[in-house]
Amino acid sequence: MSPQTETKAGVGFKAGVKDYRLTYYTPDYETKETDILAAFRMTPQAGVPPEEAGAAVAAESSTGTWTTVWTDGLTSLDRYKGRCYDIEPVPGEENQYIVYVAYPLDLFEEGSVTNLFTSIVGNVFGFKALRALRLEDLRIPPAYSKTFQGPPHGIQVERDKINKYGRPLLGCTIKPKLGLSAKNYGRAVYEVLRGGLDFTKDDENVTSQPFMRWRDRFLFCAEAIYKAQAETGEIKGHYLNATAGTCEEMLKRAEYAKELGVPIVMHDYLTGGFTANTSLAHYCRDNGLLLHIHRAMHAVIDRQKNHGIHFRVLAKALRMSGGDHIHSGTVVGKLEGEREVTLGFVDLLRDDYIEKDRSRGIYFTQDWVSMPGVLPVASGGIHVWHMPALTEIFGDDSVLQFGGGTLGHPWGNAPGAVANRVALEACVQARNEGRDLAREGNDVIREATKWSPELAAACEVWKEIKFEFDTIDTL
């Protein structure tokens, strides 16, 4: 770094470049209850000291820039700057560190995930002094979280709305995801709901394509819901995807869903954006609609271990932005998800108060105060043989979603739904009787096949289907 040079134009201002660590590395700093805290996994470029790199992260994500500027003297940097207050090496990794940064609350606009992310995960991720940077966790203080509405309704209100308690909810994504006409799509929805599932779902890329315009799909799905409700006596729903190219069009679709009297709509919150998602969440709360969230594009952001944003941060952001359900991985299916890491962010979605637990990747204690919780949705390559593990892993406050695991049944859609409902009821009963689903799960399913031919057929079809690959996202 070049030395500072005294200028003639002003007293006290020194033009030039100085090390970030002289201003932004503060190991003696005691964090405040109102600070937003961040834990970054940082890999500096060769020859860059970790203190300088960590300070650069704090600077470039708060008040700093590459050189001293005149206007530094017009504000209080000590009040507004981010501070790198701790650095710890990552065990077993060379030249990799966990860097802790504290941000003053006044740096962020109230109720705006968009602004929060623009600062903390903005330009700093392209900084040349860093080989890689990943945001592992955020501590959101109550002083900030209380500026957000959060989920439109939350877990307890949803259960009261649909009058279903004491078990996970069951869903199904309609397949094939693209190409069906609206009428055939609605027929599949009806058959699955009639068979015993609670919800069906638009796939994330079903919006309003030439083969099925959104208004037609909404109409046929609403008809299917009402018909299935009349036959079963249960409240049913279909996640009608309101995601659109503009916020205005998205809200128009949500309004039409409300006019049809359906209980729930859906949004792709990462591709749609946080501003759109928060707008839709506010609309859903005001108009009594539940909001299902799909996380399409998340793996682009969170799958690389050394660079990006961990999903636990995206999950916290969604809870603040607003959603009643969000996809969270399965642990046992075809999609990425290590058990303890997954359970860590599932707790961050559902619980009011979550203790720091590094064994599950939770770097900070998080207190959500009174913000409603979000139901985690397990989906992706799951079938009836997974039901015991899913029930044991996710518990009652979850949605277990079987797409191919319902519609791939050899006897048809409704028998596929019957098989999943019977398997779930058997697992819940066994658990309530004190049986260990982790050890006895397969026996529970086999016993249930004796009085459910639909389940027996499903078990035969998927008895050898496994997705056994190494998990990338490990601690």
Swiss-Prot record:
Primary location recorded for the protein, binned into one broad class: plastid
Function: RuBisCO catalyzes two reactions: the carboxylation of D-ribulose 1,5-bisphosphate, the primary event in carbon dioxide fixation, as well as the oxidative fragmentation of the pentose substrate in the photorespiration process. Both reactions occur simultaneously and in competition at the same active site.
A GO cellular-component term linked to this record: chloroplast
Residues involved in Mg(2+) binding: K201, D203, E204
Keywords noted in UniProt: Acetylation, Calvin cycle, Carbon dioxide fixation, Chloroplast, Disulfide bond, Lyase, Magnesium, Metal-binding, Methylation, Monooxygenase, Oxidoreductase, Photorespiration, Photosynthesis, Plastid
Annotated signal sequence range: none
Entry-annotated residues carrying N6-carboxylysine: K201
PTM note: The disulfide bond which can form in the large chain dimeric partners within the hexadecamer appears to be associated with oxidative stress and protein turnover.
Cellular localization per UniProt: Plastid, Chloroplast
PANTHER family listed in its UniProt record: RIBULOSE BISPHOSPHATE CARBOXYLASE, RIBULOSE BISPHOSPHATE CARBOXYLASE LARGE CHAIN
Cofactor, free-text remark: Binds 1 Mg(2+) ion per subunit.
Molecular-function annotations in GO: magnesium ion binding; monooxygenase activity; ribulose-bisphosphate carboxylase activity
Protein name listed in UniProt: Ribulose bisphosphate carboxylase large chain
Propeptide boundaries: 1-2
Something else known: The basic functional RuBisCO is composed of a large chain homodimer in a 'head-to-tail' conformation. In form I RuBisCO this homodimer is arranged in a barrel-like tetramer with the small subunits forming a tetrameric 'cap' on each end of the 'barrel'.
Positions bearing N-acetylproline: P3
Assembly, per entry: Heterohexadecamer of 8 large chains and 8 small chains; disulfide-linked. The disulfide link is formed within the large subunit homodimers.
Catalytic activity: 2 (2R)-3-phosphoglycerate + 2 H(+) = D-ribulose 1,5-bisphosphate + CO2 + H2O; D-ribulose 1,5-bisphosphate + O2 = 2-phosphoglycolate + (2R)-3-phosphoglycerate + 2 H(+)
Residues with site note (Transition state stabilizer): K334
Family: Belongs to the RuBisCO large chain family. Type I subfamily.
Lineage, highest ranks first: Eukaryota, Viridiplantae, Streptophyta, Zygnematophyceae, Zygnematophycidae
